[in-house]
Amino acid sequence: MYAEDKFREIYNREPETSFCPYRVCPLGAHIDHQFGPILGFALDYGVHMAYGVKNNGIVELMSMNFPKRVQFHVASVPETKEGDWGDYLRGATKALSEKYKLTKGLCGVIRGALPSGGISSSAAVTICFMKALAKVNDIELSDSEYIYLAKKAENEYVGVSSGKLDQSCETLCRKDNILYMDSKDDTYRNIPASSNIKPFKIGIFFSGLERNLASSAYNNRVDECKAAAFALYSYAVTDRRGDYELKDGLKFQDMRLRNIPEEIFKEFGVRLPTSWQKRCNHFYSEMHRVEKGVGCWEKGDIVSFGRLINESGMSSIVNYECGSPWLIKLYDILSKLDGVYGTRFSGAGFKGCCMALIDPDKADEIKEIVEREYLKEFPTLKGKYKAYICSTSTGVGKAEGDRF
């Protein structure tokens, strides 16, 4: 049953609709929160919402994916999170209400088309709901507002130290393009697929294990990167201040690895704890992979582009030290298969899924082999492991009407 049908069943009227696509990031993983550049696609799967206005200001929403109906008033959002999926709705309402006057609520049904974990379902839920809440209150949000407010909701209310990657891809992407965005200054461009590029699809291979980003090691990795940046900054200021162009008076909370030239890491990185050195190695090498990836994409060289994705995946394992036995097994299987141009963890990379760029003619064969080999290793996940073949899509901010 779809969200529209469920809404009609519950409320006995026709709904309005809202949609936000999921996203994948082939290159630029784990560096957006350090102000690095990213490359991303929006997918033709996403979060759908059927809703109707409530003039009394009450928000009443049920999910077809998670238990518990969420209910609150737009003027009295709980100050602290409750630890359920409704936190994203509460956070979105709070962020929106700090900028605009909200008088109307809504009732509705929300449904994610794919399992959660690794495709930015949390940002998609946040944006999909925010779009609907803004509409019933006659608020028209710009692309930058979608990105800023959805990020604010996750950072300040839900408690996830995410960057702008998820919200940017889900808002700004265009079909048959790859989004290049520099998280340092928010400049971006959609780069069309070259006429020379081989046909490809985006495979999403779910481990069968969902993850809670806020309670994972994600925030710890962000803090390690910031700590490494602050330490490198301190070493450079103390020992070689005149040799580098560095801003004065940077505070820890404002520190990012993008503030630190790679030359400083090469000179002083040996002083860092081993784990921090690894985080830096991932950041700087991923920056280079993104720039190389742009060149490959513009030339239509998907084979070389795929190799960079594989390298990114390995760096996530070795240097960023994310992953799990399940995701690493999926990565190992996919990276060796004929017809897979490149693969890596998607999202935080602790449970979730792997994404892969694949040859469409070999999609069925790839799905069959991955399922067989993965379930041979983890037989208890039969029925939970899932695979989907997706195409690129247009982000919510660029869409011409709702796609439901």
Question: What would you call each of these model-derived segments?
Answer:
Residues 35-42, 221-222:
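Short Gly/aromatic-enriched secondary-structure transition segments
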Residues 123-126, 353-358:
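FabD-like malonyl-/acyl-CoA
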